[in-house]
């Protein structure tokens, strides 16, 4: 079930403070965060946010089409290594 509209979007306080201070200063440094649950708001447009995926921080450049989505959607946590090749020699026996 989606979040109620009367509550508004959830963004961690520490993250929105970092974005606001960079907007006031006019800088666009990479912001490192572990908050995958935070929603992307219009104030974040043009910023690069490094989102933690459990192992490393993946840089995500925020564009207009990302507004309304969560940061965690853009840093995958699982790596797909491919399916095992069908080995006919071992099956034949």
Swiss-Prot record:
Q: Which domain of life is it from?
A: Bacteria
Q: Which InterPro entries match?
A: Ribosomal_uS19 (IPR002222), Ribosomal_uS19_bac-type (IPR005732), Ribosomal_uS19_CS (IPR020934), Ribosomal_uS19_SF (IPR023575)
Biased-composition ranges, Basic and acidic residues, are: 83-93
> What cystine linkages occur within this chain?
none
**This protein's record includes keyword Ubl conjugation:** no
| Listed Pfam families | Ribosomal_S19
* Function text: Protein S19 forms a complex with S13 that binds strongly to the 16S ribosomal RNA.
Keywords from UniProt, A to Z, are:
Ribonucleoprotein, Ribosomal protein, RNA-binding, rRNA-binding
Q: Does the keyword Ribonucleoprotein apply?
A: yes
| Organism phylogeny | Bacteria, Bacillati, Actinomycetota, Actinomycetes, Kitasatosporales
Molecular function GO labels:
rRNA binding; structural constituent of ribosome
Q: Which family does it belong to?
A: Belongs to the universal ribosomal protein uS19 family.
Which organism encodes this protein?
Answer: Streptomyces coelicolor (strain ATCC BAA-471 / A3(2) / M145)
> Alphabetically, which GO biological process terms does the record hold?
ribosomal small subunit assembly; translation
Region of interest called Disordered, as start-end residue ranges on this chain: 73-93
What HAMAP family is this protein classified in?
Ribosomal_uS19 (MF_00531)
User: What name goes with this protein?
Assistant: Small ribosomal subunit protein uS19
Note the NCBIfam families from the entry. rpsS_bact
Annotated Gene Ontology cellular components are:
cytoplasm; small ribosomal subunit
